[in-house]
Amino acid sequence: MAKLTKDELIEAFKEMTLIELSEFVKEFEEVFDVTAAAPVAVAAAGAAGGEAAAAEEKDEFDVVLEDAGAKKIGVIKAVRELVSGLGLKEAKELVEGAPKAILEGANKDDAEAAKAKLEEAGAKVTLK
């Protein structure tokens, strides 16, 4: 296998999407047992700055159904599609018992896709 130079690697990274780069970094971390997170400096970091950094590093999200809205049937169908093995009765109880977590510990892409699907069905959803 030919060895790539740093410049060739940079050019290859420029052609990748952010999602592809994110997946690359995760796989790189697993293969080489390293982490790309920079050490956090404890001194003089403002509370707002610390919260923003924590939000950027978050990789697991909970999709919380806040309100089903007027189109409950569509929301129930969307919940059944998102949560495997959920029957009609369970999905209805979940939707009517809002606010409830629909997905817990989902990655960012799955959480955003679930949020979009539920909002399209008429629900009010938050990611935590």
From Swiss-Prot:
Signal peptide segment: none
InterPro entries the record matches: Ribosomal_bL12 (IPR000206), Ribosomal_bL12_C (IPR013823), Ribosomal_bL12_C/ClpS-like (IPR014719), Ribosomal_bL12_oligo (IPR008932), Ribosomal_bL12_oligo_N_sf (IPR036235)
Cited Pfam families: Ribosomal_L12 (PF00542), Ribosomal_L12_N (PF16320)
Cysteines joined through disulfide linkages: none
Keywords: Ribonucleoprotein, Ribosomal protein
Database matches in Gene3D superfamilies: 3.30.1390.10, Single helix bin
GO cellular component: cytosolic large ribosomal subunit
One example GO MF annotation: structural constituent of ribosome
GO biological process, one term: translation
Top-rank taxon: Bacteria
Presence of the UniProt keyword Flavoprotein in the record: no
Ribosomal protein found in the keyword field: yes
HAMAP family named in the record: Ribosomal_bL12 (MF_00368)
Function: Forms part of the ribosomal stalk which helps the ribosome interact with GTP-bound translation factors. Is thus essential for accurate translation.
Assembly notes: Homodimer. Part of the ribosomal stalk of the 50S ribosomal subunit. Forms a multimeric L10(L12)X complex, where L10 forms an elongated spine to which 2 to 4 L12 dimers bind in a sequential fashion. Binds GTP-bound translation factors.
Sequence similarity: Belongs to the bacterial ribosomal protein bL12 family.
The protein, known as: Large ribosomal subunit protein bL12
Gene: rplL
